[in-house]
Amino acid sequence: MVNVGINGFGRIGRIVFRNALLNPKIQVVAINDPFINLEYMVYMFKYDSVHGRFKGTVEAKDGKLWIQGKPVIVYGEKNPSDIKWGAAGRDYVVESTGVFTTVEKAEGHLKGGAKKVIISAPSADAPMFVMGCNLDQYDPKYTVISNASCTTNCLAPLTKVIHDKYGIIEGLMSTIHATTATQKTVDGPSNKDWRGGRAVVNNIIPSSTGAAKAVGKVIPSLNGKLTGLSFRVPTIDVSVIDLVVRLEKPASYEDIKKTVKEASEGAYKGIIEYTEEQVVSADFIGHHASSIFDAQAGIQLNPNFVKLIVWYDNEWGYSARVCDLLVFAAEQDAKQQ
């Protein structure tokens, strides 16, 4: 059992907690959020506009958050170094504020007693890991690691499967991405990203993303071969990647479908899923996989040039991988003790 603390009880913090409750190897024992009081935590965890009402019990009692009859200590510190993670053996911390995303900033949790920090976002300097792609590079000596982004978690497994089988010369990615918390409901100021300041409810908004380039950090043989952009769209959850790649080895689309299907049933089971159904985005709300390959949606120009389509629940699927990485890190760390 891994005792876990969560810093930041926003979208990902809460969905990580919901996923953790489904994982018998994880016990969330503490939450820190300076902007949410205990009573409001109960409300926010109980009701969710995307994933529905929490089906278990949640209440505030004795200054703690009680979920499924188990107590969760609540802190309200702004500085990670002030959070007393070590007081009750909370060895692992999920850093989900979106603020402390560098090693230096995330290391503040170590001063409070945490032994390891998993950042639920891309990081400029922390080692990034994607389930199914580069766990062989994990070193228990790392004190801060990153689970990369939701889009990288979707893209990397698929590109690895294709690259290992056929070789990728180069590729371009577009992610048609659901709304996130940083966007605005009406036009407002956004000095660094003017288009990002436009209303999300009635616009398709082009945006930058580092997700494709980040694949090169996770899979070094693809470094410099992929880049991409994002379109923010007015849907509340589930995103889809449109990946166009030029292949070294010629392959029919049927060959590619077979390769991905075999991967989804083998080494990538639970990470990649395969569907030939006539699906749309809402069909994947609450889906646990990192990548859902849409076999009916892809197209091919010639044996070396193909467009592949993969869906992902950018909240639920990503949070499931945060939990998986937590368990993996804890198990590897235990072997070194």
UniProtKB/Swiss-Prot annotation:
Entry similarity comment: Belongs to the glyceraldehyde-3-phosphate dehydrogenase family.
EC number: 1.2.1.12
Reactions this protein catalyses: D-glyceraldehyde 3-phosphate + phosphate + NAD(+) = (2R)-3-phospho-glyceroyl phosphate + NADH + H(+)
Annotated keywords: Cytoplasm, Glycolysis, NAD, Oxidoreductase
Gene designation per UniProt: GPD
Superkingdom field: Eukaryota
Keyword flag rRNA-binding: no
Cellular compartment(s): Cytoplasm
Annotated active site: 150 (nucleophile)
KW Oxidoreductase (keyword) present: yes
Listed GO MF terms: glyceraldehyde-3-phosphate dehydrogenase (NAD+) (phosphorylating) activity; NAD binding; NADP binding
Chain positions recorded as D-glyceraldehyde 3-phosphate binding sites: 149-151, 180, 209-210, 232
Cellular component terms (Gene Ontology): cytosol
Principal cellular location given in the protein's record: cytoplasm
Species for this entry: Lyophyllum shimeji
Name of the protein in question: Glyceraldehyde-3-phosphate dehydrogenase
Subunit structure: Homotetramer.
Binding positions for NAD(+) per the UniProt entry: 11-12, 33, 78, 314
Classification via NCBIfam families: GAPDH-I
Residues marked Activates thiol group during catalysis (site): 177
Biological pathway: Carbohydrate degradation; glycolysis; pyruvate from D-glyceraldehyde 3-phosphate: step 1/5
GO BP: any one term: glucose metabolic process
